[in-house]
Amino acid sequence: MAQTLNSYKMAEIMYKILEKKGELTLEDILAQFEISVPSAYNIQRALKAICERHPDECEVQYKNRKTTFKWIKQEQKEEQKQEQTQDNIAKIFDAQPANFEQTDQGFIKAKQ
């Protein structure tokens, strides 16, 4: 029971690291805590459970017997920033010229 609680606490730490880093693997868990492979698998299982409770924040991907944890919210924020930038660029290009005219003396004034 103590090992389970300890693994879960370590998984919570890895969850916070995942949020900052954006992606984690078993190797990251091993490097972070300098533990044995079986202990790292216990932490990985606990981290999977945490991700299952927060599907809008974390995603577990499996490829070639390798488990990767990905932080989803960060990707969504980057996509939203890109969309906002594209919208701003479109607004700039779609903007109508200001209602100004140049006077005989070279000054610019608003059209009336």
From Swiss-Prot:
Gene3D superfamilies: F-112 protein-like (1.10.10.1470). Signal peptide: none annotated. InterPro entries: F-112-like_sf, SSV1_F112-like, WH_DNA-bd_sf. Coiled coil: none annotated. Essential for virus function. This is Protein F-112. It comes from Sulfolobus spindle-shape virus 1 (SSV1).
